[in-house]
């Protein structure tokens, strides 16, 4: 079972990591007041980066609450997001959304991200089976 922690190796830490996701995202999921960008990372676990600027969410209390909620939602859903580098970009108005609504919204966004993700492993394994037959 995958651990549900949010340790250092599950975070995007350097500007280079963020730039890689911004420059060539393989998945893009727009949501209400936010945008999720994702890119394959070649690892067995996902990594998360958050971009919540003062322009989009004025109060530090709200920015911290949003970061806490985003990290928690990511932590609880990380087993279905394995192998992705994910950046969440907050937009204006996100700070006014209530916690239960945000949790529900993120649940839907993670599922949309997984559905939009290409699955080459399934196609490759099907090709291998057909050659052996």
Curated annotation (Swiss-Prot):
SUPFAM superfamilies in UniProt: Ribosomal protein S5 domain 2-like (SSF54211)
Keywords: Endonuclease, Hydrolase, Nuclease, RNA-binding, tRNA processing
Superkingdom as given in the UniProt entry: Bacteria
Enzymatic reactions: Endonucleolytic cleavage of RNA, removing 5'-extranucleotides from tRNA precursor
UniProt cross-references to InterPro entries, sorted A to Z: Ribosomal_Su5_D2-typ_SF (IPR020568), Ribsml_uS5_D2-typ_fold_subgr (IPR014721), RNase_P (IPR000100), RNase_P_CS (IPR020539)
Leader sequence segment: none
An individual GO BP term: tRNA 5'-leader removal
MF (Gene Ontology): 3'-tRNA processing endoribonuclease activity; ribonuclease P activity; tRNA binding
Coiled coil: none
Keyword Nuclease: yes
Top EC class for this record: hydrolase
Pfam families: Ribonuclease_P (PF00825)
E.C. number: 3.1.26.5
Keyword Thylakoid listed: no
Classification via PANTHER family: RIBONUCLEASE P PROTEIN COMPONENT
Family assignment from sequence similarity: Belongs to the RnpA family.
Protein name: Ribonuclease P protein component
Gene name in the database record: rnpA
């Amino acid at each position: 079972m995958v651990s549900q922690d949010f340790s250092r190796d599950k975070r995007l830490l350097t500007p280079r990591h963020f730039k890689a996701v911004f420059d060539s995202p393989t998945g893009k999921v727009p949501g209400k007041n936010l945008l999720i960008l994702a890119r394959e990372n070649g690892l067995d676990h996902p990594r998360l980066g958050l971009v919540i600027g003062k322009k989009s969410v004025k109060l530090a209390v709200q920015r911290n609450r949003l970061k806490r909620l985003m990290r928690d939602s990511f932590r609880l859903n990380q087993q279905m997001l394995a192998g992705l580098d994910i950046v969440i970009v907050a937009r204006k108005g996100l700070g006014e959304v209530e916690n239960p609504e945000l949790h529900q919204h993120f649940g839907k966004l993670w599922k949309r991200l997984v559905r939009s993700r290409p699955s080459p492993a399934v196609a490759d394994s099907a090709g291998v089976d057909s050659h052996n037959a």
